[in-house]
């Protein structure tokens, strides 16, 4: 990151308060040859200040840029999955950066195409959920294979890094982010003598395509989740999901691996 000198800071809640707290850090950065920008266009490093939700917003609002490094500064009690640095210890982090004690990790994203007219990327997960109190019916296809008809509240498709988020609360597997794949998990599936789904999460490799075709039974106005944002589309017939070639480059400490974060968060 030492050669990435043009920084843009993205803030979540309490921006004015956090900017004031970051001013001494700005001075230290400028004294060390960094430039603080007011707009991300010319930045080659984008720093989110907040929590993991802020980091997801920073990536989305700046267009999932592959020519930038992304870094997260936590304002909470401790560092998190996307935030390797803490706002109270940024000066220490700067020393680690100058001593080359950091690594750049590439995180995969998924690409979603809705009805051939709307497409977007997700760093954590894509979710498709019922917007009314009625069973959601979706025909699930893997590549050209009709796999199953899902009935329930919805489906969540997660990346490896997103496997520790919404997916984990659905009893999905935690997946090493070095494995190029994506995972499909169910939301309250309906399983009885008449209707049957796989009943468990399943993982697809990077060459697979997942197609979700909605049955037109009055529930074709779903809630579409893009990480921590909702997309409003009046009518949806199908969504096609693939692992994207687009990867997000993030800055992490050498002594703070993905599995160390998992251990610290859940064990």
From Swiss-Prot:
InterPro entries, alphabetized: ATP-NAD_kinase_N, ATP-NAD_kinase_PpnK-typ_C, NAD/diacylglycerol_kinase_sf, NADK
Family statement: Belongs to the NAD kinase family.
Record keywords: ATP-binding, Cytoplasm, Kinase, NAD, NADP, Nucleotide-binding, Transferase
Pfam families: NAD_kinase_C
Location, primary (coarse class): cytoplasm
Record has Metal-binding as a keyword: no
Biological process per Gene Ontology, one example term: NAD metabolic process
Entry protein name: NAD kinase 2
Compartments (UniProt record): Cytoplasm
HAMAP family: NAD_kinase
Gene: nadK2
GO cellular component: cytoplasm
Active site: 52
Binding residue positions for NAD(+): 52-53, 124-125, 151, 153, 164-169, 188
